[in-house]
Amino acid sequence: LIHLAAPAIRECLAALDGVDVAHVPLLLCVAEPNRPGRFDGIEDHLLGEIQDELGVQFHRSSKVVARGRTGGALAVKGAADLIYRGRFPVCIVAGVDTYLVAGTLAALERNQRLLTSENSNGFIPGEAGAAVLLGPPTGKSGELQVLGAGFGKEAATILSEEPLRAEGMVQAIKGALTEAGLSMGDLDFRITDVNGEQYGFKEAALALSRILRVRKEEFDIWHPVECVGEVGAAIVPIVLGVALAGHRKDYLVGPKVLCHFANDDGDRAAIVLQGK
């Protein structure tokens, strides 16, 4: 995990533009504690080991966020609080995770969640490290602004027998839209963590049908997991990177983006972005 996360964080350090790293908090997102096969004790030692690898010492406000896929959204919210309330110049949000360990793969196989020649309703496991540098708006062209974040809890999880109504995702998306001061109809497209399982696409469709109140000819959904595999806690910085690259290279569907994320345990999160 150290060697997945460190190169991505190093790129953020290279963009600090004179800011002392000792004044930069690092919010490091990792797998949720109840994930089968998860490495023991990563909350206790991974942050320090990454600092040793990079040869730097981040601000003491740095911490590990052990909340899986939705952890990155919590970290983005936390970074905003640190920047605006703690008056930090910037903050790094990083995520690192792997599904390529025996215990994790065995649990996924038992629940028939891996994509195989005999199971089309599954995903390809992967591993990744990703990081983004967040700061206050500068007004420069090419910026991607976080307008809002919201969170929810879903009772009908992927392993439950309850009927899915996307209550948790609706709650998360509405929270993000309220904070952004926008409606669903104002947004141009979506980038999500759906990984190929039918559950995720169904949840996204249900949430959209329950919130969207205007007719839209199209409302694209991008899913980077198709390219990188299921990468758990690394997905939020990856999605932010995809959105930023698309904005700067002018291939986004439009400037306003809804990003949403889901954990197996029911945690839900959404972020609204806007390119400037």
Identify the role of each PLM range:
Residues 1-3, 35-78, 87, 101-103, ...:
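Conserved catalytic cysteine-centered active-site region
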Residues 1-38, 78, 82, 164-190, ...:
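Conserved active-site "lid/cap" helical segment
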Residues 21-25, 59-60, 86-91, 120, ...:
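Short coil/turn connectors at secondary-structure junctions
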Residues 27-30, 66, 91-97, 259-262:
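Short beta-strand segments
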Residues 76, 129-137, 240, 244:
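Alpha-helical metal-binding/catalytic segments enriched in His/Glu/Asp
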Residues 101-102, 154-157, 198-201:
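Short acidic/glycine-rich loop or secondary-structure boundary segments that cap or lie
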Residues 109-182, 188-189, 265, 271-276:
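Condensing-enzyme catalytic core mediating Claisen C-C bond formation in acyl metabolism
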Residues 188-198, 224-231:
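A short beta-alpha structural unit
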